[in-house]
């Protein structure tokens, strides 16, 4: 019987939890602010990890840029803390990527909501 998850998937889940804790408790850079780790992708040999993040204030482009610069600057420190927290032979090289899927999802949801409202208005006007 085949295993349900690959090891890289399990490691990615654990990295996501650990990095979320590290960002919340250990990293004190004011540029980073309120950041959420939305997903982690780990290479099959566990040497690289892409960490997808979102920020609380997604509408402010400069805050996002500053937050990403802060994360990039802190990545060696975060990697060292990750190595201490996890028992891995090789701690993956981490790269932070801004996750726009949440913002795009909200934009699409707003578009659908607006279309539904306009459609309801047309039906109300037609019935009168």
From Swiss-Prot:
NCBIfam families: rbfA. It is found in: Cytoplasm. HAMAP family: RbfA (MF_00003). Pfam families: RBFA. Belongs to the RbfA family. It comes from Haemophilus influenzae (strain PittEE). This is Ribosome-binding factor A. Its main location: cytoplasm.
């Amino acid at each position: 019987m085949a295993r349900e998850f690959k090891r890289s998937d399990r490691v990615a889940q654990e990295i996501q939890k650990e990095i979320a804790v590290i960002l919340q408790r250990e990293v004190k850079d004011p540029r980073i602010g309120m950041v959420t780790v939305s997903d982690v992708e780990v290479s099959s040999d566990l040497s690289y990890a892409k960490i997808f993040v979102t920020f609380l204030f997604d509408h402010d482009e400069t805050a996002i840029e500053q937050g990403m610069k802060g994360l990039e600057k802190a990545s060696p420190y975060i990697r060292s803390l990750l190595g201490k927290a996890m028992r891995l032979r090789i701690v993956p090289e981490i790269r932070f990527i801004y996750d726009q899927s949440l913002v795009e999802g909200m934009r699409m949801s707003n578009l659908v909501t607006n279309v539904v409202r306009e459609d309801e208005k047309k039906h109300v006007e037609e019935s009168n």
